[in-house]
Amino acid sequence: MAQSESSPTPGSTSGTATAADDREDELAEPGRLISSRWRPRSLRTTPSRQDRGLFDQPRGLPWMLNVEMWERFSYYGMRAILLYFITDTVAGGGLGLSETSGQVVIALYGMAVYFLAIPGGIFADRIIGPWLSTLYGGVVIMAGHICLTIPSTVTSWTGIVLVAVGTGFIKPNLTTIVGGLYDDDDIRRDAGFQLFYMSINVGAFASPLLTGWLREHYGYHAGFSSAAVGMAFALGAFVYGRHKLSAFAFTVPNPIRPEELRRLLLGTLGVLVAVGAVVAALQAVTGNLVTTVATAGLLVPVGAAVAYFVVMFRSPKVTTPERTHLRAYIPLWIGAVLFFMITEQAAGKMATFADSNTDL
């Protein structure tokens, strides 16, 4: 996945030209800027300590704070009313699923958001760079919110899927872009990320209040429309503020070679076939679609996590000191998994409890 902690050192690799070279540097060399109509003509390549703006931070940080605040506004605003929308009756403007089915959908949605950060990071790190990955993810999210504003079952489910996919692309890569604003020895990094996380909390605090009020007075689709507006603001800030970013945001740190791309596509196809086989086997055993989906939603990410750690430990690009650090990271990773398991209950079990046991 894309590395967020340092800016790359410009360099080049030698080799025989191939047909892939004609793709406007979409498969760029490490440290080379990709060719895109969105890339500014001038970008900072000097040490980050020379880039000073608001709060003595890099000039690109305030724009990324705006992006993150509005993106989290849209995400948490939608999530605040999503379970109620799924389980409410059709006459009440919902999708009419049972409470159990709704809980499973919410769990799968939360799993997908984090799980899809893996392909989102791969696209940024190996194919199109973090800025374009974030842009495409934001566009997909806004399209999903717009679909949710349309009172139709098909568009509603489409919107949920699009938001999950888009969030998987934008969430890891926006953090990467912020990390790329600082050099390794820049002491302002910690303060910058504190501001970044503060922007997350601001957006997450305000959005449920607004979407909940809109849902109460004008219906679910009005609540989802506020999420779409929030994402539009995020995209506007992201595009307008791109001139303030470092060159790192527009590079492909570890470009994929054609033969690696073929292996990646075949591997992805194999994973999809394996997941389909697991789901079919579970359905044959349980005979209950909800149980099957819930079980698959547990087994697939666990298997993916194990496989990901195996790949990182066995990769020739990982040095011995890095493997030592990776082993030390595993307990922290397990703790983070447990934390987010509890946190994600806010959109599921906690939402059901609040709906059934509180009277506001």
Model-derived features with residue positions:
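Intracellular loop-helix junctions on the cytosolic face of multi-pass helical membrane proteins
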Residues: A2-Q57, D184, G212-A351, D355-L360
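Short amphipathic helix-loop junctions that connect adjacent transmembrane helices
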Residues: A80-S101, A346-L360
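Interfacial helix-cap and linker-helix signal at transmembrane-aqueous boundaries
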Residues: I86-T87, F123-D125, L210-Y218
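Cytoplasmic loop-to-transmembrane helix junctions
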Residues: S101-G102, D185-L195, S199
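Central cavity-lining transmembrane alpha-helices of secondary-active solute carriers
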Residues: Q103-A124, K171
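Primarily marks hydrophobic transmembrane alpha-helices of the MFS/SLC 12-helix fold
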Residues: S133-T134
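C-terminal ends and interior cores of transmembrane alpha-helices
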Residues: V139-W157
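Intracellular juxtamembrane helix-capping segments at the cytosolic ends
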Residues: F169-D183
